[in-house]
UniProtKB/Swiss-Prot annotation:
Native organism: Eremothecium gossypii (strain ATCC 10895 / CBS 109.51 / FGSC 9923 / NRRL Y-1056) (Yeast)
Protein name from the UniProt record: RNA annealing protein YRA2
Domain of life: Eukaryota
Alphabetical keyword list: DNA-binding, mRNA transport, Nucleus, RNA-binding, Transport
Segments for region (Disordered): 1-63, 143-196
Subunit (UniProt): Associates with mRNPs.
InterPro entries registered for this protein in UniProt: FoP_C, Nucleotide-bd_a/b_plait_sf, RBD_domain_sf, Yra2_RRM
GO molecular function: DNA binding; RNA binding
Family: Belongs to the YRA1 family.
Skewed-composition ranges (Basic and acidic residues): 149-159
CDD domains: RRM_YRA2
Length: 196
């Protein structure tokens, strides 16, 4: 029996393990990790976060049209030329994949989406038939949040300051009085020397 085993046997304590330092204070105080976490994130704290999350309006969905299986050698401009007879899209994005490309468009008038499917579904481009379908895409933010974020971005670019400034504001330069000329300095010195 080693000395450490003998000493630990007499005191009834567990042998100290270096790993305990990484486990946090709760394990060394005899509290289980679950007790510590339950106190930290109790039901009242969790419900506050849930309430705040539920209070936000759900993000809007956007009905968009998706062009799939576009060959890699078809440029964005060729797809734009296909749509030149239609009104200008509110949203357009092109995606490159390993073996093909895809494009997503959103129009203000949803009837144009059906027209896109009728006109371009099954169209052959550079030897491949493209697929056109309508789908709903979940927006990231509610309209008010998106509008505020874009407004903030525009204001910052235009030079408007938002929020409180960080740190001290720079002092404005005070206009210095004009430097006296040599004649003015000589006259001042003569007046001083003569006691006038």
């Amino acid at each position: 029996m080693s000395v450490d085993e003998h000493l630990n046997q007499g005191t009834g304590e567990k042998q100290y393990r270096r790993r305990d330092l990484r486990n946090g204070l709760a394990s060394r105080m005899g509290l289980g990790e679950s007790t510590y976490r339950a106190r930290e994130y109790g039901p009242s704290r969790r419900s506050r976060f849930r309430d705040r999350r539920d209070a936000r309006p759900p993000p809007p969905t956007h009905q968009r049209v998706r062009f799939l299986n576009i060959p890699l050698d078809v440029s964005d401009y060729e797809i734009d030329d296909l749509l030149k007879d239609l009104p200008k899209p509110l949203y357009s994005k092109f995606y490159d994949h390993e073996d093909s490309r895809s494009a997503v468009f959103e129009f203000e008038d949803h009837s144009i989406l059906d027209k896109c499917v009728e006109l371009y579904n099954g169209l052959e481009l550079h030897g491949a038939k493209i697929t056109v379908e309508i789908f709903e895409q979940q927006g990231r933010f509610a309209d008010s949040t998106r509008t505020n974020r874009s407004t903030d971005h525009v204001e910052k670019e235009a030079g408007f300051k938002t929020g409180r400034p960080r740190g001290k504001a720079r002092a404005t330069k005070k206009e210095k009085p004009p430097q006296p000329t040599l004649e003015d300095l000589d006259a001042e010195l003569d007046a001083y020397m003569n006691g006038n």
